[in-house]
């Protein structure tokens, strides 16, 4: 499956950030999002959002920390290629 497109990280504060992306309507049943502290390769936090969503707010982040985040679309239990970004709070 092709990955979702145009992953943008916006509204970054000391402890939160908004993710937004694009994908064709009904292309995916859900999206899997994973993120972790980039430098320390901390344990990834993994979550799932409905396939109708095109944004998600990450909360509870650490100030002054670089994060790696990626998103995959899921259709019929099969994940797409990942789309990733790096951002700093």
Show the residue positions of the predicted features:
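Extracellular low-complexity, O-glycosylation-prone stalks/linkers
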Residues: 1-59, 66-89
């Amino acid at each position: 499956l092709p990955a979702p497109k145009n992953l943008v990280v916006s509204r970054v504060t000391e402890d939160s950030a908004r993710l937004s992306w694009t994908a064709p309507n009904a292309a995916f049943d859900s999206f899997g999002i994973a993120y972790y502290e980039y430098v320390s390769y901390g344990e990834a936090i993994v979550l799932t959002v409905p396939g109708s969503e095109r944004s998600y707010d990450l909360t509870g982040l650490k100030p002054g920390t670089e994060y790696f985040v990626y998103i995959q679309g899921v259709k019929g239990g099969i994940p797409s290629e990942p789309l990733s970004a790096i951002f700093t709070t």
